[in-house]
Regions:
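Short beta-strand/loop motif that positions the catalytic acidic residue
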Residues: 190, 196-198, 202
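Catalytic histidine-centered segment of alpha/beta-hydrolase-like enzymes
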Residues: 229-243
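Hydrolase active-site cap/lid region
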Residues: 126-176
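Conserved alpha/beta-hydrolase "acid-adjacent" motif
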Residues: 203-209
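Catalytic nucleophile-loop/oxyanion-hole region of alpha/beta-hydrolase
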Residues: 74-104
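N-terminal cap/lid segment of alpha/beta-hydrolase-fold proteins
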Residues: 2-32
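Conserved alpha/beta-hydrolase
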Residues: 58-80
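The serine-hydrolase catalytic nucleophile loop
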Residues: 46-59
Length: 259
């Protein structure tokens, strides 16, 4: 990911917590700015708000003038609970969004979701009455049943760091298939602008997920399948192909997220 301009001072984030519908404590960080809207980032599976890729994204967004918040999905980072692969996580996003609306001057929120965070963003917009301005979805999951990773033992080190083993998420293995919400079903209820970004032949979540979501979604919508070498997934794209993804993100946010 490209770095923010040296002249821009990024403030230390303020941390907050909310209590979700079932008593689960959810943590988030806020990088404040005087913008009339908020960008709320939902990391993907095995990522939390303190991961370098998420911190770098917050700095990039803040340098562009966006008030930015990043949350720990349940079962990740400091948040309590266990991760259910889009079972109850949308309640957590709703709780964070409502707290931010109550404690700031913002009038709208753009959700940026990575991987399973993209699915959760879709379900949040579909199932809760929030002033959502737009959805920016990077390598989003359409349906758990569609996940078929293509693992190459010769290149897997490019995608998964050994340090991941030290920060394992807590998973709700008992969540049945029927309890996992299919984002491809919820997307039809979302009327705000939507942007889908995916690397062609993503090794973990095939770009067919974004295609399926795009085809089911209503206008306004846009789909960008990046034909770049490496089959990279989610936030890793910012590290290896920032020149390809950052202009797409900036253009979409400039059109739909006031600052």
């Amino acid at each position: 990911m490209s770095s923010a301009p040296a002249i821009h001072a990024v403030p230390e984030p303020s941390s907050g917590t909310v209590i979700s519908f079932d008593g689960t404590t959810i943590h988030y960080d806020l990088y404040d700015a005087p913008s009339p809207s908020m960008v709320l980032v939902i990391p993907g599976f095995w990522r939390d708000r303190k991961h370098p890729s998420m911190v770098n994204l917050a700095h990039l967004l803040h340098a562009d003038g966006y008030r930015t918040a990043i949350m720990d999905p349940r079962g990740h980072g400091e948040s309590e609970g266990t991760f259910g692969f889009n079972a109850n996580e949308h309640y957590d996003v709703d709780a964070v969004a409502r707290r931010l609306l109550e404690t700031s001057t913002i009038s709208s929120i753009t959700l940026i979701g990575f991987s399973y965070g993209g699915a959760i963003a879709i379900s949040t917009a579909a199932r809760h009455e929030l002033p959502i301005a737009s959805l920016l979805l990077i390598s989003p999951v359409a349906d758990f049943a569609m996940i078929t990773p293509k693992i190459n033992p010769l290149t897997i080190h490019r995608h998964i760091a050994m340090s991941n083993a030290l920060h394992r998420p807590r998973i709700a293995w008992g969540v049945r298939k029927l309890q996992k919400i299919r984002a491809v079903d919820d997307i039809v209820k979302v009327r705000v602008p939507k942007c889908f970004i995916h690397v062609k032949n993503d090794w973990l979540i095939h770009h067919g997920h974004s295609v399926a979501l795009y085809e089911a979604a209503s206008e306004p919508k846009e789909l960008h399948v990046l034909d770049i070498e490496g089959n990279y997934h989610s936030d890793r794209i910012f590290h290896v192909a920032s020149d390809a993804i950052e202009p797409l993100m900036r253009d979409f946010l400039a059109r739909y997220t006031p600052r």
